[in-house]
Swiss-Prot record:
SUPFAM superfamilies tied to this protein: Lysozyme-like (SSF53955)
Residues in the signal sequence: 1-41
A GO cellular component entry from the record: extracellular region
Protein name listed in UniProt: Chitosanase
Active-site residues per Swiss-Prot or TrEMBL entry: 63, 81
Organism listed in the record: Nocardioides sp. (strain N106)
Family: Belongs to the glycosyl hydrolase 46 family.
EC top class, as a word: hydrolase
Amino acid sequence: MRLKHPTARLALAALLVAVPRSVAAAGTVHAAPAPAGATRLAAVGLDDPHKKDIAMQLVSSAENSSLDWKSQYKYIEDIKDGRGYTAGIIGFCSGTGDMLDLVADYTDLKPGNILAKYLPALRKVNGTESHAGLASAFEKDWATAAKDSVFQQAQNDERDRSYFNPAVNQAKASLRALGQFAYYDAIVMHGPGDSSDSFGGIRKAAMKKAKTPAQGRDEATYLKAFLAARKTVMLKEEAHSDTSRVDTEQTVFLNAKNFDLNPPLKWKVYGDSYAINS
């Protein structure tokens, strides 16, 4: 994932790593109140189409300083973060593998497309910041491909497969839409691995501080621990040192107890104000 704002950077490679879901707390012989997480089952999750669109707008406000995420299919540039080109709706990167996967999938769907000829170059530059075999011609052809609905769908599919679905699936057992979004935004920026600075590491650090709702702890306490763990990781890197997407976005929703992420929503990212009214 890319961050176009000068204080932010792209996420790590999109290599799916399964993270175990929390196990629900066992019941007792005597009747007892259900854990806070149990009430979430009746709520609308982030995979609801409208909620998903809200999530994309929230991410786009930080990534592109715009709520119009559907205008980002054509986006491509080198943001000088050591990961080569950053492009598309969630910043697929030539240096981290997900751009290669995307173009390969697009070619499976539409052989002979305008980007297919760059697959050999994308394989060579994977893991580097190099533009070898790409450069301005690739940028132009990417923008052309972005007009193709098949390529747009390929971007949507790669987003879901590598970022959105893993985040939501790992949150569903315990967290409502806000918590699911917190996972998604984290996996977008930090990658889905298990290292201490990845989503998996952040989640593990949070769970050492607070149990999940499925384990009997209230949702707010766990989410505060998760956001605090994420901030700790962000502050270790200069490129992530502006933590406003946590402080003046997600924490604002949490303090308002808007666990279902219901509009109207008002927040700030990097000092810019945004609103979703419906």
